[in-house]
Amino acid sequence: MLRLTLLGGVGEVGGNKVLLEGEGCALFLDFGVSYHRRGRFYEEFLNPRSSFGILDPLEMGLLPPLEGIYRDDLQPGGQAQKTLWERYRERPAYRSLDKDSVFGVLCSHAHLDHSGYISVLNLDIPVYTTLLSALVMKAIQDSSRSDFEQEIVYAVERRPRNDSGLLETPPASQQPARQRPFVVFGDTPTWEAVDFWRQTPATRPLAPKDLSFAGGEAALGPFRVRCYPVDHSIPGAAGFLVEGGGLAVAYTGDLRFHGHKGDATEAFVRAAAEAARRLPLVLLCEGTRAGDDDHGPITEQQVAERALDFMRTAEGLIIADFGPRNLERLTIFHRLARHIGRQLVILAKDAYL
């Protein structure tokens, strides 16, 4: 028998965290940051206190109180560590989990509202995702500020500063960053991808852990997991079909039909329908823009055509504004700028990505 616990992403945009359990084993379907909840307490230059580790996110309700799965080095040292979980054990969402029973995180894509809090999970818990998503996650971390919330692919393990329990980051000369295990579906990593994975532009050295390759599916304890590419604004997005305990779970992550890979989303839908003919199916579906729309969505091709019509006649500076990490939209404007003889100016982190 399978058990599903929705820990985030319900009644909100993003923050997806789903716990799937069966036969003493567990998987997470995404482990993201809730932008709305985080935005109630923090902003760009006001973030959780690094010396307090996971205490601030737990206390603010940004992390579910799941004892046993978070990084030990982000839990206060000394006496504070002994009493950390006492305050949460009476909360309704509290669970105690054995990290060794967690076979991994199935991460649908690299947007932080689906992947961001992988950073605080125990570093022995592997991430299963597509090769492209893994590389994008690393590129995002390479070009982001250095703090524990950004440490999805590799992490600097903290240590207690003193008996107060406060944490500190060891100097780069004393401790390399530790890489989390990643298992990728789909394409076999090229040597360029492997080389990129094993390096970091930071001054702190990296203790690399090679990418593992799963092909099209993986057996994780009692679960059979299959990964399907889907259309989304960031490369590498995928949906998952998980079978076990006489049940199938289709998890869409974020998906759409109106981009350049809409046919991939259609293929995932057909695979889920086929699974539903064999087994009872639970569908966990993205619903941010669900609803009746007689006009249908505007396709990315239509966006490109309308933008080009404007850009051809515009004089002076043209400013294009769209969401961060929307690489498809970025490449559209790069192509259009070249087409009309304009120069595209972007941030260094976008160029790195």
Model-identified regions with their sequence ranges:
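His/Asp/Glu-rich metal-coordinating catalytic cores
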Residues: R3-T5, G9-E12, N16-G104, S119-E328, ...
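Metallo-beta-lactamase
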Residues: V102-D113
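Gly/His-enriched, cation/cofactor- and phosphate-binding structural elements
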Residues: L344
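A contiguous, basic/glycine-rich beta-loop/short-helix subdomain that forms a polymer-engagement track
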Residues: L347-L353
